[in-house]
């Protein structure tokens, strides 16, 4: 085996160079942003001429070539300049080899409450959903770090809006009448009332829990008001002037005589 194969130049030449191995990326290229399908309407306005909810506030994006990008990709729409609204996937940037010390691609940050658009379930994407439209002019996906994207997704998964039941007047009247009879109805009574007012027994149970909490708050506030009134009467009587006390004493003597 020739000794030239073990020279410094040959050994260094066999190692991959970072500048040559990193995928080329244009300076102006940004991470693509994918919008969900909007049921026939684009993000910035309806195709039929009628403007959408936000069509009057946000102008249509214009591509560098002069044509707006409205084509659907994998059932989703793309937006320019990294500005986004709603559910989207941010594709991870190309990563170099291990010799460059590059950060490995971020795995898909998904949760059960956020659906994943088809075709973008790969490990090189980050799911961020949703973002309020008030933040649209100020949010830039390209400037967000990996930790910020994870926090956005965790915030959405943690805060899940509950469905609020709206009771009718007849239902509220029946519930209130039973509450005046008993504060803690049993399961049979709750089921009977639920069938009567066309509600689920769980809804009746939750209503009674909230009503008892309200009743305790009202009871506590009324007791505090009565205590404050008694304290005020005591302090006002103790601060009476001596002249007033003498007049009251004279009036008592005159009444006795």
From Swiss-Prot:
Residues 213-257 are annotated as: Disordered. Signal peptide: none annotated. SMART domains: HOX. GO terms for cellular component: nucleus. Its main location: nucleus. Transmembrane segments: none annotated. It holds the Pfam family Homeodomain. It comes from the Eukaryota. PROSITE patterns: HOMEOBOX_1, HOMEOBOX_2. Belongs to the paired homeobox family. Bicoid subfamily. This is Homeobox protein goosecoid. It comes from Saguinus labiatus (Red-chested mustached tamarin).
């Amino acid at each position: 085996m020739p000794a030239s194969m073990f020279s410094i130049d040959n050994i260094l030449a066999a190692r991959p160079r970072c500048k040559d191995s990193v995928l080329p990326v244009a300076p102006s290229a940004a991470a693509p942003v994918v919008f969900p399908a909007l049921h026939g309407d684009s993000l910035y306005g309806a195709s039929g001429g009628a403007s959408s909810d936000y069509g009057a506030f946000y102008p249509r994006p214009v591509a560098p070539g002069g044509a707006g990008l409205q084509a659907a990709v994998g059932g989703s729409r793309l937006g320019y300049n990294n500005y986004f609204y709603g559910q989207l996937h941010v594709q991870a940037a190309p990563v170099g080899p291990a010799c460059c010390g590059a950060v490995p691609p971020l795995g898909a940050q998904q949760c059960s409450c956020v659906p994943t658009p088809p075709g973008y379930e790969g490990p090189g994407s980050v799911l961020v959903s949703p973002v309020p439209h008030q933040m649209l002019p100020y949010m830039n996906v390209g400037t967000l770090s990996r930790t910020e994207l994870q926090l956005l997704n965790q915030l959405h998964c943690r805060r899940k809006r509950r469905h609020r039941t709206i009771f009718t007047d007849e239902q509220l009247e029946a519930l209130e009448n039973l509450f005046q009879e008993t504060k803690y109805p049993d399961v049979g009574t709750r089921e009977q009332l639920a069938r009567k007012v066309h509600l689920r027994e769980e809804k009746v149970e939750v209503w009674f829990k909230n009503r008892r909490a309200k009743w305790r708050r009202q009871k506590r506030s009324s007791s505090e008001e009565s205590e404050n009134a008694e304290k005020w009467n005591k302090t006002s009587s103790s601060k009476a002037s001596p002249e007033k006390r003498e007049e009251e004493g004279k009036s008592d003597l005159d009444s006795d005589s």
